[in-house]
Swiss-Prot record:
NCBIfam families: PRK00197.1, proA. Keywords: Amino-acid biosynthesis, Cytoplasm, NADP, Oxidoreductase, Proline biosynthesis. It comes from the Bacteria. Pfam families: Aldedh. InterPro entries: Ald_DH/histidinol_DH (IPR016161), Ald_DH_C (IPR016163), Ald_DH_N (IPR016162), Aldehyde_DH_dom (IPR015590), G-glutamylP_reductase_CS (IPR020593), Glu-5-SA_DH (IPR012134), GPR_dom (IPR000965). Its EC number is 1.2.1.41. It comes from Dehalococcoides mccartyi (strain ATCC BAA-2266 / KCTC 15142 / 195). One of its GO terms (cellular component) is cytoplasm. Belongs to the gamma-glutamyl phosphate reductase family. The keyword Metal-binding does not apply. Pathway: Amino-acid biosynthesis; L-proline biosynthesis; L-glutamate 5-semialdehyde from L-glutamate: step 2/2. This is Gamma-glutamyl phosphate reductase. GO terms for molecular function: glutamate-5-semialdehyde dehydrogenase activity; NADP binding. The gene is proA. CDD domains: ALDH_F18-19_ProA-GPR (cd07079).
Length: 424
């Protein structure tokens, strides 16, 4: 164990040392590194898929659920998507060096801000091997060194991906030590990593509530967490039913295992009888299980062939990550807002309505990272928000909120231009 602890300290030290030349690397160099990464992924597809197959085999043997298994799978198509996302990050404007908020003071000093990298970012994450590439690419583009610590369930995939990333970075003339990967997945080592505040500037955990809570409680380093998503859609009395059905279907079914998938559907009582049987019929085609409150049960028990069970108390406020939806009929917009305030996680909430006043109340009163009107909750995503890939979706209010793109992993320094001024 002592050897493993020393190895982590050395990786952090190397990342810190590499962060300095990386911080002033040219945009062309950083973009070349990202393009190299994309090419390496595609050129080494057979080896990556073989490593991922090992992860799948071990995960199945360990009894991993289908929802969790889907998160770790890499297919040729998904690998091509990861490479495409990396190229998209390369094509984004480089935030480093941006000058903003410049003002001339009465004494003639010109004062403003210059955007700079944070330094070294440690990413602690679970399940998804694409996160290894996404986070490395974003950190490099923003001039940050990165320490990657994935979960044991994707160790084979992450190991080869990290090796290829380091190779691609070095081929672009940047220090490969700017990307560090911790192969030892022992839980106790995370605790040690979280104490290295002299080398690491920010920790980003991505995963379940247990991981995020552990990191927040044990870190000596600032943390920006990609929070869990307990996501609601409220179908207002003035909703367009066709739009509401499409939005509820897409939000639940398109990819149910991700944090921006809908968990709870709130429906105004005046539209429930017309709307619920239609959406339930569509959901039933995809195998969605509905956990309904008493009023929704009465409407749906004879209306469709959907999987229908009474909602339990703990179904409200639950992130299902599966083809399961809690459904509740509410008396008013006020009740919907109160329900979301009590059970929401601050991730994404959406209203479907044609009533402008209701939409504005929802936008103003819901406290979440992303609040939507007449749109699927699945849009809360870095690429959909024009940020490229993301490091996570923060449900915090400091330092970043919502999808975390390039600017969210930079800071700034004050710059001052003088002409011989002295303070009297």
């Amino acid at each position: 164990m002592e050897k493993a602890l020393l190895e982590i300290e050395e990786k952090a030290r190397l990342a810190k040392a590499a962060s300095r030349p990386l911080s002033y690397a040219s945009s062309a160099q950083k973009d070349a590194a990202l393009k190299n990464i994309a090419a390496c992924l595609l050129n080494n597809a057979p080896a990556i898929l073989e490593a991922n197959l090992k992860d799948q085999t071990e995960a199945k043997a360990a009894g991993m659920t289908a929802a969790m298994l889907d998160r770790l799978i890499i297919t040729q198509s998904r690998l091509e998507g990861i490479a495409k996302d990396t190229l998209a990050i390369a094509a984004l404007p480089d935030p480093v060096g941006e000058i903003f908020d410049m003002n001339t003071m009465p004494n003639g000093l010109v004062i403003g801000k210059k955007r700079v990298p944070l330094g070294v970012i440690a990413a602690i994450y679970e399940s998804r091997p694409n996160v290894t590439v996404d986070i490395a690419a974003l950190c490099l583009k923003a001039g940050n060194a990165v320490i990657l610590r994935g979960g044991k369930e994707t160790i084979h995939s992450n190991t080869i991906l990290a090796r290829l990333i380091r190779q691609a970075v070095e081929e672009a003339g940047l220090p490969q030590e700017a990307v560090q990967f911790i192969e030892n997945t022992e839980h106790s080592l995370v605790n040690h990593l979280l104490k290295l505040s002299d080398q690491i500037d920010l920790v980003i955990p991505r995963g379940g509530a247990g991981l995020i809570s552990y990191v927040k409680q044990n870190s000596f380093i600032p943390v920006v967490a990609g929070g869990i998503g307990v996501v609601h859609i409220y179908v207002d009395a003035d909703a367009n039913i066709a739009d509401a059905v499409n939005i509820a279907y897409n939000s639940k079914v398109q990819r149910p295992t991700v944090c921006n998938a809908m968990d709870t559907l709130l429906v105004h009582k005046d539209i429930a009888a017309a709307f619920l049987p239609v959406v339930a019929a569509e959901w039933s085609k995809a195998g969605v299980e509905i956990r309904a409150d008493k009023t929704a049960m009465e409407i749906l028990e004879n209306a469709s062939s959907c999987k229908l069970i009474p909602a339990a108390a703990d179904d409200w406020g639950k992130e299902f990550l599966a083809l399961v939806a809690a459904v509740k009929v509410v008396d008013s917009l006020d009740e919907a807002l109160s329900h979301i305030a009590r059970y929401g996680s601050g991730h994404t909430e959406s209203i479907v309505t044609q009533n402008y006043t209701s939409s504005q109340r929802f936008l103003n009163e819901v406290d979440a990272a992303a609040v939507m009107v007449n749109a699927s909750t699945r849009f809360t995503d870095g690429s959909q928000f024009g940020l490229g890939a993301e490091l996570g979706i923060s449900t915090q209010k400091m330092h970043a909120r919502g999808p975390m793109g390039l600017k969210e992993i930079t800071s700034y320094k004050w710059i001052v231009y003088g002409n011989g001024q002295i303070r009297g």
